[in-house]
């Protein structure tokens, strides 16, 4: 019997959609509320996005604001800021979303 080549299915994901969600959460408390009600860190395909969302979720649960500074500080406290792309990547996520409605659409 001949063996067939097996190609595993890739999980559905869009790095751009994930970045849109992160950018929207950083800019809009309404988008943040929707994201935290709907998503968990495990819903993100990239490890970097999982870690960023997890840091955001930690801040949210503690009742802290979510913005570039607080998320950057939380990631720094965890020792993961550099591994997720640093402050520059967080800023890129914000700039990637021209309106938070786009990020909300991807939740």
PLM regions and their residue ranges:
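Noncatalytic partner-interaction/assembly domains of nucleic-acid and motor enzyme complexes
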Residues: 1-104
């Amino acid at each position: 019997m001949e063996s067939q080549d097996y190609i595993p299915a890739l999980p559905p994901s869009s790095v751009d959609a994930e970045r849109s969600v992160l950018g929207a959460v950083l800019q809009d408390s309404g988008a943040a509320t929707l994201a935290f009600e709907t998503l968990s860190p495990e819903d993100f395909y990239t490890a970097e996005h999982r870690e960023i969302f997890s840091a955001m979720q930690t801040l949210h649960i503690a009742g802290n604001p979510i913005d570039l500074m607080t998320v950057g500080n939380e990631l720094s406290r965890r020792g993961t800021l550099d591994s997720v792309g640093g402050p520059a990547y967080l800023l890129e996520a914000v700039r990637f979303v021209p309106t938070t409605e786009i990020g909300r659409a991807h939740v």
